[in-house]
Amino acid sequence: MTTTPTGLHAPDAVVRFEVRDGHTALVTLDRPEARNAVNEAVAKALESIVDATEADPRIRAVVLASSHPDVFSAGADLKEIAAGRRAGLRTERGGFAGLVFARRDKPWIAAVDGKALAGGCELVLACDMVVASARASFGLPEVLRGLIAAAGGLYRLPRALPPNIALEMIATALPIDGERAHRFGFVNRLVESQHVLEEALALAAQIAGNAPVAVRESLRVARAALDLDEQSLRRCGVDGMAIAAASEDYLEGPRAFIEKRPPRWTGR
């Protein structure tokens, strides 16, 4: 049975959670009146969702979207900061928004059709893949306010873009649009605005159709490639293969191929 995080179906919920097609979690930021700015309620909700999706064997991919027609997220709620409640915008385990530093194995896909700025951009950078429209925009304007992008943006952006482009964005506070982000490889799939969520869910479905253990271990090694030396990565790869080979799905793939049928993945 799919685990549903508590409190996300209340009328005043700031983050919505639903399961699509049995294997994809759709997470929707829903503070349109505040341009989906992150407050304590958002941070707690996202951390709860990370915990629930990681614990649920049915969930194989997560899509992070927005209910606002023009904004993905404006980042930190400055009213909360001005009121002395900055600490509430992060959680001990997940960091800013309960997500950017969260330990997780399952892939997250950001569906962006609008502005993803400051902490909103850092939410996108915390995801594994991005589906966006040409009118989407990504930026770290913190220096305009005497701040820095301390929720991962300053080191994740240079990994996601050519370093000189990232440095320009950080130093000038100027954003780039979805088309340019796609050209640089930051955006995986560029589609018309009305198809962003649909395409993100389709990408999630493609991932969910593969062997869950193999996807998890493959992504674990691929993510580690950004931080580890080659020798450590080899060990990481060997460990991942051992885990995949010990799973029930390891033999199911070849059997399904030989029997000319779709594989029946168990995730075990």
Could you say what each language-model-derived stretch is?
Residues 1-26, 30, 174-208, 216-226, ...:
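Amphipathic alpha-helical segments at domain termini/boundaries
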Residues 45-47, 51, 78-116, 145, ...:
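An acidic, glycine-rich surface segment that forms the CoA-thioester-binding/catalytic face
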Residues 1-69, 83:
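Conserved CoA-thioester-binding segment of acyl-CoA-metabolizing enzymes
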Residues 228-233:
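Short beta-strand->loop
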Residues 27, 31, 45-46, 64, ...:
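Terminal peptide-recognition signature
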Residues 99-213, 238, 242, 246-247, ...:
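Crotonase-fold acyl-CoA enzyme core
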Residues 69-73, 117-118, 139, 222:
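Short, active-site-adjacent cap segments at secondary-structure transitions
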